[in-house]
Amino acid sequence: MKLHQHLPLLALLTPTLALAGMNDDPVLAKLDVKQLEGAYRDSDTRLVWNLEGWLGTDLHKLVLTSEGSRLDGRSEAQELRLFYRRAIAPYWDLELGWHHEPLAEKRDDRALLGISGTAPWFIETELNLLAGPGSDLTAELNLEREIRLTRQWVLTPEAGLTAHNFTDRNEHQGSGLTDLDLELRLAWEVRPDFAPYIGVAWERKLGDSADLTRASGHDVEETYWRLGVSFWF
């Protein structure tokens, strides 16, 4: 059969193929509760959460994150972020948006520029730059690696490093490297979307921040035992 005899059939198939192509990247939504836990240190028990919700496609997403803690029924720390996430390379995204700390002494609203993705050796990497009033800048680096011990048991080491280019004595924060956070979690994946876990976290103030914290009578390092659950839907 010659090519011109196929043309009517191709004409009929073209709209169907175009519609299928439009649905290759559908709009989806997800809520990921990465951490919902009790953090235990001496006689203190904190409720800690870290969650992310998004709406969009593989290429474009609108993302809202919330992270914070409560002690004795009162919120002691909280961060909200709303940003646009765009895929820029396989396994890598660019993020641009807004960072807000509602519990800060002064209203804390900053612009957010970040990049996140999977580095070699399957290390989940997040690098964020927060720009505040004037020339105030904060840089955050977070690294995480999931190590699957068995089909259900997963060990996750995590590290975080924070730096500032300004001093805030009210928050016992100096300029330069300020915080180092290390954490280790062991999770049991009951289902792919539900996993209870136990863990330990170590937090350390660095540089001038350590000096300001020590001068205020507070500890420069803290260790927490953690018991919690992660889930998504």
Language-model regions, residue ranges each:
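Repeated loop/turn-to-beta-strand initiation elements of outer-membrane beta-barrel proteins
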Residues: 59-64, 90-94, 121-125, 150-155, ...
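Membrane-embedded beta-strands of outer-membrane beta-barrel proteins
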Residues: 51, 82, 113, 141-143, ...
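Detector for outer-membrane/organellar transmembrane beta-barrel domains
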Residues: 107-169
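Transmembrane beta-barrel strands of outer-membrane/channel proteins
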Residues: 35-38, 64-68, 96-100, 127-131, ...
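Outer-membrane beta-barrel "beta-signal"
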Residues: 184-189, 219-233
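Residues that define the transmembrane beta-barrel architecture of outer-membrane proteins
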Residues: 27, 45-49, 76-78, 107-111, ...
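Residue-level signature of outer-membrane beta-barrel architecture
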Residues: 55-57, 86, 117, 129-131, ...
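Outer-membrane beta-barrel initiation region
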Residues: 2, 18-73, 86, 222-225
